[in-house]
Amino acid sequence: MSRSVALAVLALLSLSGLEAIQRTPKIQVYSRHPAENGKSNFLNCYVSGFHPSDIEVDLLKNGERIEKVEHSDLSFSKDWSFYLLYYTEFTPTEKDEYACRVNHVTLSQPKIVKWDRDM
C-alpha cells in the first residue's frame, strides 16, 4: 500500500514539474502573398514555442481588434511547446497598419508585432 502511495505522489510531483516550465512565445506576422494595395490577401500571425498553452492572440487593424479571425487547432512540438496560426482575409492599403497582439503568462504586458509589408 505505501509503495502505491509513494508512486502516486511521485507521479503527481513529476506532472506538477511540467507546469513549472514557461516559455515565451515567438511571434511572426506575414501575408500569404506579396502585398499589393487594394488586392485581397491573407494576414497570418504564427505564434510558436510557448508554454503553458493558455494564450490570447488578436489581429489588429490600425490598433483595433479584427473581429472575423480564424485559427488553427492548438498543437505542440516534440519539445512540448505549443504553436498556433491566426489568420484573416484582408485588403491592404497604403495607410492601414496591421499587427498581431499576444498576451501570455510569460509576458509582463501584451506584445504587439507589426506586419511588415516588405517581408
Curated annotation (Swiss-Prot):
Gene Ontology annotations for the cellular component aspect, listed alphabetically: cytosol; early endosome lumen; early endosome membrane; endoplasmic reticulum; endoplasmic reticulum lumen; ER to Golgi transport vesicle membrane; external side of plasma membrane; extracellular exosome
Disulfides per UniProt: 45-100
Domain Ig-like C1-type positions: 25-113
Chief localization: secreted
GO terms of biological process kind: amyloid fibril formation; antigen processing and presentation of endogenous peptide antigen via MHC class I; antigen processing and presentation of exogenous peptide antigen via MHC class II; antigen processing and presentation of exogenous protein antigen via MHC class Ib, TAP-dependent; cellular response to iron ion; cellular response to iron(III) ion; cellular response to nicotine; intracellular iron ion homeostasis
Mutagenesis or variant effect for residue 96 to N: In AMYLD6; reduced stability; in contrast to the wild-type, the mutant aggregates into fibrils with classic amyloid-like properties under physiologic solvent conditions
Record's subcellular location: Secreted; Cell surface
N-terminal signal peptide: 1-20
Cytoplasm recorded as keyword: no
InterPro entries named among the record's database cross-references: B2Microglobulin, Ig-like_dom, Ig-like_dom_sf, Ig-like_fold, Ig/MHC_CS, Ig_C1-set, MHC/Immunoglobulin
Family affiliation: Belongs to the beta-2-microglobulin family.
Protein name per the record: Beta-2-microglobulin
Upper taxonomic lineage: Eukaryota, Metazoa, Chordata, Craniata, Vertebrata
